[in-house]
Amino acid sequence: MTDSIQKIKFPELIFGFVAPIGADLTTTVAAFRSYFGRRGYRVIEIKVTDIYNVLQRYIVPDEPLAKSPLHRRYATYIAYGNQLRAKFDDAILAATAIRRVMSKRLKIGRTPEEHFSKTAFLIHQFKRKEEIDLLRAVYGRLFFQVSIYSRRGARVDYLSRKFASSDHATGHLRYRHAAEELIQVDEDEVGKLHGQRVAKIFHDADFIANLDAPENIGNQVDRFCELIFGSNSISPTRTEYGLFLAKAAALRTLDLSR
């Protein structure tokens, strides 16, 4: 039976990005695109919230989706995501992303091997554990969660400057309060059953890209992707080894035989 299952040498890979608001996602996504482009992979980028333009025709937003100013756009998009999760379930945005992967896949080639070979899907971004759980259930070991780290102060500064630029304002300091509020909502919407929970899923990542690290993002991404393809020339860093020991210790505390 197993002899009839054809092995795919370069299978499709699915990357789901988790980034707190204010962390610059574009640099990390571009690094993944560059790596897989060099590997000869077809790279398809899917932005989760792009589906809002279609969904709002059938499910009218309680708050109309704003295009500008930027801080208002973020707030209305967050509210609509909460509304969709309340109407369906907390994994709804992951489900729509999976549907879009299926649609893209069918346009790639004529044979099953072409459908499932040498394609990297970069899907951004997710905010709930239920979304990640669904993606792992569907794609198994072909799915990788990528979290993007940037310290809070840097995110507030980055976001306030974006708000100022969007409003064509000369100073960004008066936008810092709006940036702080939005970052808090994004991390954990206390009191909102179907709100965003980035802080709850961030550390479950298969890879954390550190925007504040001295090593550039391209090198971090290349190292991770080489490990995916089984490179045996890369040793764990001291930090990675420490994380492994901490994880192993945590698992031992859950051992029912103890």
Language-model segment annotations:
Residues 12, 41-43, 139-144, 204-206:
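Short glycine-/polar-rich loops that comprise or flank the Walker A/P-loop
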Residues 1-16, 37-42:
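Extreme N-terminal, non-catalytic leader segments
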Residues 24-25, 82-99, 217, 235-242:
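Phosphate/oxyanion-binding active-site loops and adjacent basic polyanion-contact surfaces
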Residues 131, 149-151, 161-223, 250:
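Small-molecule kinase domains that catalyze NTP-dependent phosphoryl transfer to phosphate-bearing small molecules
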Residues 37-121, 125-127, 131-133:
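ATP-dependent small-molecule kinase phosphotransfer cores
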Residues 234-258:
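Short, basic/aromatic recognition patches
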Residues 122-164:
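ATP-dependent NMP and nucleoside kinases share a basic, alpha-helical "lid"
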